[in-house]
């Protein structure tokens, strides 16, 4: 349900999956640098609700990043199907060619893996630069969108 807000807030109806794809090295041997997935939908819902920009760059990213998603541990409960979107922003602590680390004060939990990690750019608006993959005690981590992954993601549009 794109733009879902609450139990009944479904302004764009629904879309269903027609194809699933995941990073081959993640599937074969759990390689965390290839931990990404794509769900192809039965409609071009992005033509109705808009598209999040995508970007890759060779150099390091700086500044803040935001993660938005539907965490499971919200509003005093633990939901399998949380209907409320939350977003948090934090500084990038480090990144390299394959991964990006951002500080723990960017609150994420189970259910947000696969969410976009994004920044705002004047020329492209809100733009995904990584894919959230998880957290540990002090840091969140995302898979950076590098050139090959950028081209793969764009091919689904």
Question: Which role does the model predict for each range below?
Answer:
Residues 1-47:
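Conserved catalytic-core segment of clan PA serine endopeptidases
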Residues 3-7, 42-46, 71-73, 122-124, ...:
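Acidic glycine-/aspartate-rich tracts in secreted/extracellular proteins
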Residues 34-36, 62, 99:
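Extracytoplasmic
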Residues 40-46, 52-81:
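Short glycine/Trp-rich loop-beta-loop segment that forms part of the substrate-binding cleft
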Residues 83-93:
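Short beta-strand-centered aromatic/proline hotspots
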Residues 106-131:
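Catalytic nucleophile loop of clan PA
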Residues 129, 133-157:
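C-terminal cap/linker of serine protease catalytic domains
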